[in-house]
Design a protein with these regions (language model features):
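N-terminal beta-alpha "docking/capping" segments at the starts of catalytic domains
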Residues: 1-36, 41
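Acyl-thioester-dependent condensation/acyltransferase catalytic cores
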Residues: 40-139
């Protein structure tokens, strides 16, 4: 089993997990058709390179760490929903929480309208990256 050392900020975020929203929330609007198969593949290529995105936080009382998970699939990385892109739907997808004990440290849903508009709703555990890292991450997808 591969482990990653938990940094001080990981531990602080874990301790305060019940007091504030430790997630980064983002909605990316696409004009034109989005191929969900290619998007899934792009997400997987990035996630494969960044171990913490496919790790579970183990809250060991003395020495917490990240357990790297290798048993994830492309299908788990992106949900696809068909229908109208409403503010209510986007908000519903953006207020979700990512469980630090889960296999993946993000949730991504592509909402595809019947026309040429799609919205990628992305929620990622802030422990994994800050805002600048998130911009770099999503620009590679």
């Amino acid at each position: 089993m591969k482990k990653l050392k938990a940094e001080m900020w990981d531990k602080v975020q874990y301790i305060f997990r019940n007091y504030y929203d430790g997630m980064i929330h983002c909605a990316i609007v696409y004009r034109g058709k989005v191929d969900e198969t290619l998007l899934r593949r792009a997400i997987k290529l990035v996630v494969d390179k960044v171990d913490v995105l496919h790790s579970s936080f183990v809250a060991h009382p003395i020495d917490p760490y990240w357990r790297v998970n290798d048993d994830y699939t492309e299908e788990e990385m992106l949900d696809v929903v068909y229908g109208d892109v409403s503010h209510e739907k986007i908000e519903e997808l953006l207020v979700r929480h990512v469980d630090y004990r889960g296999k993946l440290q993000f949730k991504a849903t592509l909402v595809k309208e019947s026309g040429d508009k799609s919205v990628l709703c992305f929620v990622i555990n802030h422990i994994c990256c800050d805002g600048r890292d998130f911009i770099r991450l999503t620009s590679r997808i």
